[in-house]
Amino acid sequence: MITHQQALNRLIDGNELFFDEMLDIMRQIMRGDMTPAQIAGILIGLRVKVESVSEIAAAATVMREFATTVPVAERRHLVDTCGTGGDGAHTFNISTTAAFIVAAAGAQVAKHGGRSVSSSSGSADVLEALGVKLALSAENVGRCIDEIGLGFMFAPNHHTAMKYVAPVRRELGVRTIFNILGPLTNPAGAENQLMGVFHPDLVGIQARVLSQLGARHAMVVHGRDGLDEISLSGPTLVAELKNGWIREYELDPAEFGFSLCSAADLAAPTAEDSKARLLAVLDNQPGPARDIVCLNAGAAIYVAGVTDSLAEGIRLAQELLTSGAARQKLGQLVELTHKLAA
């Protein structure tokens, strides 16, 4: 077993930790075997050296080991739409809104997320504002996914070992490897994923990590405007992982018939603003908010395996808004979470 001193010396010298070594270090952190100063040293050492695909994959593997898992019966179209956040754009909750459409399409959405860190409203904040109960057991979250095709996994409920890391991250106040681990540690083990990232360099990196972790079909995306979603203001960088192969390309929303807009057109300063935007989209009100949600929901429908192409996924997303089926999913989630939390 590698000690934290040995690991830190390796990192200071600019050398990568081997996969098994990173497993050891991460387990020590998650068991509470390291002091806050030792944890901080490792995190900063990794950040300065720049985390490798192997190190990130090992860290995610251990976080999955320590997570409270969510049992899901039907896994064929199981998908997550969790992103890294941290893009600083303060848009409304695009991926959360998209989740209702994806569930209405027949996928099983295991939505993983938490409260706001860098944005005005995290997925948990807006869902709570909508009346969704977050304090559910892992078994009851699984029931939500099985019964209505959508369940929300509130990250602090499933990653309790993070209690050793959270104070250190807060005091450091800089990005660490944990800023990119959240979307890699879905407690339901979703093998299909639409993941937005806050930096262009992470597009290829996270796709390779997902491949190493055994993902089946995933799209890792970063808008050229900095958005950690598929953007409407211009091209989006994409790394698509499918059946072990990774293809990197740019996606232009104009090719799918969408008009361009700016991030300001999608702004939501508070959770209440985000709630209003989300409801407007689910009520099929036309405009940039509806367009960007259809674009991202279409991608999630595609990676979930419900459709064979992104274009088909987008068309289905638009139909589900028009029919009101996506709006019904919100009502179903509120009703079921209240019943299970009682």
UniProtKB/Swiss-Prot annotation:
- Residues that hold 5-phospho-alpha-D-ribose 1-diphosphate according to the record: 83, 86-87, 91, 93-96, 111-119, 123
Q: Which cofactor does it need?
A: Mg(2+)
- The residues the record assigns to binding Mg(2+) 2 are 228-229
- Give the pathway: Amino-acid biosynthesis; L-tryptophan biosynthesis; L-tryptophan from chorismate: step 2/5
Q: Which GO terms describe its molecular function?
A: anthranilate phosphoribosyltransferase activity; magnesium ion binding
Residues annotated as binding anthranilate 1: 83
Name of the top EC class for this enzyme:
transferase
Q: Which residues bind Mg(2+) 1?
A: 95, 229
* Known role: Catalyzes the transfer of the phosphoribosyl group of 5-phosphorylribose-1-pyrophosphate (PRPP) to anthranilate to yield N-(5'-phosphoribosyl)-anthranilate (PRA).
Q: List, alphabetically, the InterPro entries matched.
A: Anthranilate_Pribosyl_Tfrase, Glycosyl_Trfase_fam3, Glycosyl_Trfase_fam3_N_dom, Glycosyl_Trfase_fam3_N_dom_sf, Nuc_phospho_transferase
Where do the annotations place anthranilate 2 binding? 169
Protein name listed in UniProt: Anthranilate phosphoribosyltransferase
Q: Which UniProt keywords apply?
A: Amino-acid biosynthesis, Aromatic amino acid biosynthesis, Glycosyltransferase, Magnesium, Metal-binding, Transferase, Tryptophan biosynthesis
In terms of NCBIfam families, this protein maps to: trpD
Q: Name one GO cellular component term.
A: cytosol
The record's note on quaternary structure and interaction partners says: Homodimer.
Query: Which free-text remark accompanies the cofactor?
Result: Binds 2 magnesium ions per monomer.
Question: Which organism was this protein described from?
Answer: Laribacter hongkongensis (strain HLHK9)
User: Family per UniProt?
Assistant: Belongs to the anthranilate phosphoribosyltransferase family.
- The EC number on file is 2.4.2.18
Q: Which domain of life is it from?
A: Bacteria
**HAMAP family xrefs:** TrpD
- What chemistry does it catalyse, as a reaction equation? N-(5-phospho-beta-D-ribosyl)anthranilate + diphosphate = 5-phospho-alpha-D-ribose 1-diphosphate + anthranilate
> Tell me, what is an example of a GO biological process annotation in this record?
L-tryptophan biosynthetic process
